């Protein structure tokens, strides 16, 4: 029996109805009938060690449960072999749709093929799976994230548009790291070509680990001394490692540091002045939206996918959510107003007299 999943890929002028056929080739998992049977979603996560992913999981599960679906969650602790094994377990369990946050976007192509062999559609969550016949990609506009990081840095150098910087990329295995870099490159290119901005040191922070980011900043200081104006860090974890290195050199608060994810510790650094900005990615919208889309795919309903992203094998129907730049000036109007973080959490460690008025007072 063939299983047909319909996705509407919309543009400014037209909508195209795509019928993506997943052949159930032997031993397929039982599929949810449209609108009646209870949907079972398999959620395969790279890791739950970071607070960000625990938040995604909780919001996703709550929304899916609210729609009458069951979610089976497995986390691979950053190991590709474990994650492939997790997918095998989920397929054996009899899931109707697989949602995967890949540790390695290329390695998990095998997991997509396994799911399709079992007649199960696959959604890549936040990180795309490369070189695979992926059914749907749900994420943020990650090139835009990099553009916003670099634009803020350029505009807020001591002399706007001129300076010496350190660049910290993310994990090479994470396709998002390449997208963030592409967005940064797009903004920085003319300044680098003119020689207005100089990159004194750059490297990849493998596994996104703060300690690797700290080593990159330490290497920059060893190579060129503390003569740089900013650190273009690609997320809040690497920003934290950069800030630690700067603290040890007495440079924290004097060197601009970027970030991403609006982690609580990063918001606290922004309030304290040791990190300049972060990118707020409304996880609630992403996780709830992905849960809704997963249920629709499991029930063979029409899904509207306004974008398409090339994963090396196909143009994957994609739903990309927008992001917001957060600085000390708009903490209250963004993450606090949205309920993403509390006033007390953000300003913990800041003397009462130095805090802005509490909302509602």
Language model segments and positions:
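A residue-level marker of the well-folded mature domains of exported/periplasmic proteins
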Residues: 2-361
């Amino acid at each position: 029996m063939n299983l047909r999943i319909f996705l509407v890929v919309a543009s400014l002028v037209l909508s195209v109805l795509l019928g993506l056929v997943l052949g159930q080739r032997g031993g397929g998992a039982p599929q949810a009938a449209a609108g009646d049977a209870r949907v079972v979603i398999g959620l395969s996560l790279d890791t739950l060690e970071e607070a960000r992913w625990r938040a995604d999981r909780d919001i996703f599960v709550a929304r899916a449960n609210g729609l009458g679906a069951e979610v089976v969650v497995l986390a691979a602790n950053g190991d590709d072999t474990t994650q492939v094994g997790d997918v095998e377990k989920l397929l054996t369990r009899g899931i109707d749709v697989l949602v995967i946050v890949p540790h390695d976007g290329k390695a998990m192509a095998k997991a997509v093929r396994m799911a399709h062999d079992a007649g199960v559609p696959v959604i890549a969550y936040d990180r795309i799976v490369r070189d695979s016949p992926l059914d749907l990609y749900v994420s943020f506009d990650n090139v835009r994230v990099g553009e916003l990081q670099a634009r803020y840095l350029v505009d807020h150098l001591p002399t706007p548009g001129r300076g010496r910087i350190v660049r910290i990329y993310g994990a090479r295995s994470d396709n998002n790291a390449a997208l963030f870099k592409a967005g940064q490159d797009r903004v920085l290119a003319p300044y680098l070509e003119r020689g207005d901005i100089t990159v004194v040191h750059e490297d990849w922070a493998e596994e996104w680990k703060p300690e690797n980011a700290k080593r990159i900043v330490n290497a920059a200081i060893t190579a060129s001394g503390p003569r740089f104006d900013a650190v273009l860090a690609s997320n809040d974890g690497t920003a934290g490692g950069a800030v630690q290195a700067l603290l040890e050199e007495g440079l924290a608060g004097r060197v601009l540091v970027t970030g991403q994810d609006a982690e609580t510790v990063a918001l606290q650094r922004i309030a304290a002045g040791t990190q300049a900005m972060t990118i707020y990615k409304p996880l609630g919208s992403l996780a709830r939206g992905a849960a809704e889309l997963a249920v629709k795919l499991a029930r063979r309903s029409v899904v509207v996918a306004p974008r398409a992203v090339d994963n090396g094998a196909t143009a994957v129907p994609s739903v990309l959510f927008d992001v917001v730049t957060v600085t000390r000036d708009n903490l209250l109007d963004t993450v606090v107003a949205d309920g993403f973080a509390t006033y007390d959490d953000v300003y913990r460690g800041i003397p009462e007299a130095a805090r802005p008025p509490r909302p509602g007072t």
